[in-house]
Amino acid sequence: MKNAEIIAKLNLEQKCALLSGAGTFTTRGCPKAGVPSITLSDGPNGVRKQAGAADHLGLNPSVPATCFPTAATVACSWDPALGEEIGRAMGEEAAAQEVAVLLGPGLNTKRSPLCGRNFEYFSEDPYLSGKMAAAYVRGIQSEGIAACPKHFAVNSQELRRMASDSVLDERTLRELYLTGFEIVVKEAAPKTIMSSYNLVNGTYANENAHLLQDILRSDWGFSGAVVTDWGGSNDHALGVKNGSTLEMPAPGGDAVRELLAAVQSGKITEADVDARLDELLTLVLDTSAAVQKHSRSFDADAHHALARRAAAESAVLLKNDGGILPLAAGARVAVIGDFAETPRYQGAGSSAVNSIKVDTLLDCLAQSGLQCAGFAAGFDRQGRPDAAQKAQAVALAQKADTVLLCLGLDEIKESEGLDRVDMKLADNQIELLQAVEQANPNTVVVLNAGASLETPWLAHCRALVYGALGGQAGAGAMVDVLTGKVNPGGKLAETWANAYEQTPAKDNFAGAGRTVQYREGLYVGYRYYQTAGVPVAFPFGYGLSYTSFAYSDLKVTADSVTLTVTNTGARDGAEIVQVYIAKPGAEIFRPAQELKAFARVPLAAGESRTVMLPLDDKAFRYWNTRTDGWEIEGGRYEVRVGASSADIRLTADVDIRGTNATDPYAGKALPHYKSGSVQNVPDAEWEALLGHPIPQDKVRIDRNMTLGELNHSRSPLGWLIWAVLTALLNASFKKGKPDLNVLFQYNMPLRALAKMTSGAISMGMVDGLVMELQGFWIIGLVRVIYEAVKNQLLNAQLERRLRND
């Protein structure tokens, strides 16, 4: 152990105490043993350190910081070097604010476009997600503090996120949901990783030995600290035994007593506690030393400029009929849309940054050389019809050469704690677009949203620019793109389906109960659409430019792909070269093709460049459930190089030596998985892939019952709590602004009451409440009162001992 000398100075109670937080974002310290307390902070696209009363949802104000574009935005740059720059800037700001651990980036696979937190995640593809996340981690940790990639693992929804069970086969787990994390661990060596709230195949992620020990620590060699998501610990002792280091936020004395009792009963050993403590001490001592040495200032203007460049390089030009963009200098433009005045530039929840400053499109246009004919809001942000606003916008559109129409999703559509109900743009925005286009066909739509949308309205605009959620400088970046100061080079990091009904997980996403069946298996995003032959609106990797590019001279080996890329247009630009691997006629079923390498290549007009893209150990492998390892199917593979997953420019074959492993699916009838048509996989085939019966879903009145399930309790108290929460939730929907506190409570299991209240509520009190909800009113009430008195006495005694030791 690295910290054996310090550990030897501590008694068992002190050791156990250090393995849980002291406050919402602080760890416990032990000054007599030389152990300082450190501060952790959100978030993935900027620092959210709260100066006063702290909460994990972003409800209370935080210290001003740079709000960079969200991960979903920067992923469209396909530029790890840019991600590393952003990470370095965030690390610098975190250290300046005395934050030792920055809780990000998030790299959960975008299983469905409806996940309300997709704006925080990079991509539907694990290779792209992993490469971008690794870059962020390297940047953050270059400042001496710790990055904390999250949420490990298979955490793809917000509904019942603290109690849902993600059920999937081992191959899908390894190839699709863990590969991104594997890349981060092996290429960036994060000092911490955050475990997810959910269960994975029946066991909570934070106490899942298969995830934390077998895979994370043994297979990948991770030696850092695993931190729970806030309130995400189910069984603290099992977590410690199976590889979880630090329980957050502040469970109080109950967590300490739980570990002490577990050691005394033999459930865990003191050696287990020491192993976790060694990981924690390494984190605390290394990062606290770095923070102490760091400057307490940073260059806010330089970071704003970086945020603007990042947003500009990530913007995706989806349509440009007749080359209407870029706009000519002096063009007279009408600016329409509420988002031009009040931008949507980040998502809601724990990632929300108190931005140092925020650009608006109106302000930035005034400095662009364009003439502004005027501004009209045009629509109500929350979707309510407003004929007067629409009429004003139509009248303005007639007075301009070009209309800049700013559309997008409002705050209630994309938030932590809440999944989207559809992929649609609000009706009032679509109606406005149709009316404006009739008044002025030269309509350019600027779209702000953190995830994909249905676009049946696409014919009503001449150009469409996707700015995603561009951060505090996103509006300035958009003006740079619209005017041609920046040539858009971004490409989509997720497929845009024609309709939600055509997405692979449409019948299984979020689940009807606690059990969430990942029946689609490997076929997520482009892996599904291209294998099953389903047309899409915009394919994965798609994006236009103000110039054009040619591909030539392809050379392929088992280790690399080399080609020449030429800018054949009149403008400087950047092309994102994408390499996909396919195996026609494969014996082991697999997607039609998979991304295995990419590079962003800047080129001056007329310039040619030779590009070499390495193929790593992930290029040809698959997970074999019979050998329980990575294998390679031997034979001829096709290497496809293109400008998107659907725009393949060059191909070449390469022969690869296989490992001659046994077919893991021999004797199994899996027609839907072999064809990729996985929307309606029958139970028998799903069970054959899983290797066991489908888990039965049943709401149980226990510690893990969520407050949103209390209508199933046997108690008027439970029904009342559920009714009040539901009413508050519906009220926030009507206001168009998510009530994050209510959303969290609605999806929160009862056990979290003991994990999120700084020791005020013990698990014994929760058990008494459960008895009440089961219908045992008197016994339950007596238990709650008894446990409350006991908890207060024990907490006071513990704190006295810890202060005196």
Where are these regions (language model features)?
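Terminal connector regions
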Residues: 617-664
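Long, compositionally biased, glycine/small-hydrophobic-enriched stretches that function as flexible linkers
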Residues: 693-805
